[in-house]
Every structure is written in structure tokens, then in C-alpha cells.
């Protein structure tokens, strides 16, 4: 909760589409990849070789890069999105079959996106609040300028009434 609000635009807001495409690519590779068994075997071998938590995190990142090297066209991405909508039951089964490391990767990516979205919302609120303060100050200046003119008019009217 100790996050700072900045009026600057988030640098990663533009990369949301890239992240979404990356996740779709990874999901697409998991569904249709013929080497799936070999990759899971590599994950198991790397997990047994790793001795510390830092090495395990590094291994997870290496496997993620291996899954995303293959370029995917926009048509394939839209087809994947349709498959996701239609086959929610299939997705649940695939999630149950994923290795723990992969689930942690997906969880971390989702948390990162959530944090990014929250920061974007906070930045927007801050910018709007800042603009509201500026408009409020401007309106105060305008009303104060009018009050001086109104006071002069009152004095003039009072002096005219006294003369009559």
C-alpha cells in the first residue's frame, strides 16, 4: 500500500498488448505443441539440477523463452481466443496437468498485469484530480475578479442613491 502515485504515464501500458499476445502464444504452444512431453522432461531435469531458489527462478525464465520463440500470426491468435472462449472445460483440464513451475509463472504474470492495471488507474485518477484542482483554482480567480467589479458597482450605485 506504500505505492507512490505519479502523474507520468506508465511505460508498460503500451506493452499490455504484447503481454496478452505472449500469453496467447504460450497457451497456443501448450495446446498444439508436439514436443510437449520433451519440454516437461527438460523442466524436471532442470529442477533436479537446481540447488537454490535463484537457480530455479532462472530455469523458469529459460523455459518461458523457449516457449515463445516461435512467431504467431494475428489470425492464429484470434483463433486461439475463440478456442479459449469455447473450451473453458478443456482449459481447466490443461491447468490441472500443468507443472507447478508453469502455474507459478502464469500466476506471476497475472499479478504483474493486475499491478500494472492498478497503477494505470491510479495514474489516471491522479491526473484527473490534478486537472480538477487547476480548474477549481481558475474558477476561484474568475470569481474573485468579478467580486472586485461587483463591489465597485455596488459603491457606484450606493453613491448614486445618496445623490438622488
UniProtKB/Swiss-Prot annotation:
It is a peripheral membrane protein. Involved in retrograde transport from early and late endosomes to late Golgi. Links the Golgi-associated retrograde protein (GARP) complex to the t-SNARE TLG1, leading to the fusion between the endosomal vesicles with the late Golgi. May also be indirectly involved in apical bud growth. Residues 77-93 have a biased composition (Acidic residues). This is Vacuolar protein sorting-associated protein 51. Residues 73-164 form a coiled coil. The keyword Lipid biosynthesis does not apply. Its main location: Golgi. It holds the Pfam family VPS51_Exo84_N. It comes from the Eukaryota. Component of the Golgi-associated retrograde protein (GARP) complex, also called VPS fifty three (VFT) complex, composed of VPS51, VPS52, VPS53 and VPS54. Interacts with the t-SNARE TLG1. It is found in: Golgi apparatus, trans-Golgi network membrane; Endosome membrane. Present with 319 molecules/cell in log phase SD medium. GO terms for cellular component: cytosol; endosome membrane; GARP complex; Golgi apparatus. The keyword Coiled coil applies. Belongs to the VPS51 family.
